Amino acid sequence: MAVNILESNMGKDVSQWFETASVDRYNLLKEYAKENRHHMTDAEKALWNILRQPKCSYKFRRQHPIYDYIVDFICIEKKLIIEVDGAYHSEPQQQEDDRIRTETLSNMGYKVIRFTNEEVLSNPKVVLRTIKEELS
């Protein structure tokens, strides 16, 4: 699925809205995404603060619907998805689900990188450096 960029005139400014799922799926997932934004983990909050810094130089969205998924973070311009994995991602079934999810998103042209909660919280500089390398 391609990313469609639709521009709409919002007063004097023109803003961009990104459609990354079918309209029906997007409308369903956006409600879950909104809820997720209000209940972020400590690691997700920490990474969001990193991604919002001017040092990052690219715009990221958090809890964004793509296809059948809600990704933790995405830079649409660079087609980079960042997932922050909690402890349950070490469970065999979740690892298989994550593999399928990553493969599906990769087949759609996205690069998916993953960090554990511990990596984000204990090594934020390393996480930022890794993200910057992926963006360049």
Regions found by a protein language model. Give the residues of each.
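Solvent-exposed, charged helical/coil patches
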Residues: 1-58, 107
